[in-house]
Amino acid sequence: MRNKGIFVIAEMAWAHDGSVDKAIDIMKAAQEAGADAIGIHVTDIPTYMVPHYGSGEGRVSAGKEHLKVYQYVLDINLAHDDWIRFAEVARATGIALCVMPNDKVSLEFCEAHISPEFYVLAAAAFVEAEFVKAVAQTRRPTFFRIGGATLGEIESSLNLFRSNGGGEITLLHGFQNYPTKLEDTNIRQMQSLHELFGAPVGLADHIDGGDIVAKTVPLLAWLSAPHALRSTLHGIGLKRARISKRL
């Protein structure tokens, strides 16, 4: 990771809606807009989710609320060959890959076929000791999405990651709602988290944009990564993350 300047991650998540061509279009648009990395979620659905997981408003794209989440996500999940093609185009385009592998099967696939520059661990994965170890053993720089985790869970996962030879760590703090209210961001906690855990800390939430990134600069945060819906692209989890590196 860089030591100065602005590092921008555009997180696509599931905004591709099951189309690798749409995913590539989003990735290219992000690169043209100045993003340094594209964030993707790689998931083996049968490993990751139980079939009876429910649906509802705000959980899937508008108009799809009647569908079960499992079947909906299964239908829009990109195949391994799609991700390989996506990664090849990303490399040719000159944008780094920041991957959240949601399960062990996906992590093994990413290591064998994608070799991303960065990994992301969601807070829900902090209690999966073997998975945290496996990500650590890749030695790749890793973002810890700590929103929703207790201090004890963060400490335990970081200790486990570090004791298994993990790469560079960055914590991403943030209360994630759709959208996150500005008063819920609690950006001053970033400084406390940095002091507690001895790692760079950034902001990762679902605010609508604006000047929140600039407000993190006086806190001497190494990273700030608010997520904002891009008005011209619609889909599940489309976010633009701006990351300010060690100002």
Residue ranges and their predicted role:
Residues 1-247:
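Catalytic cores and adjacent flexible loops of soluble metabolic enzymes
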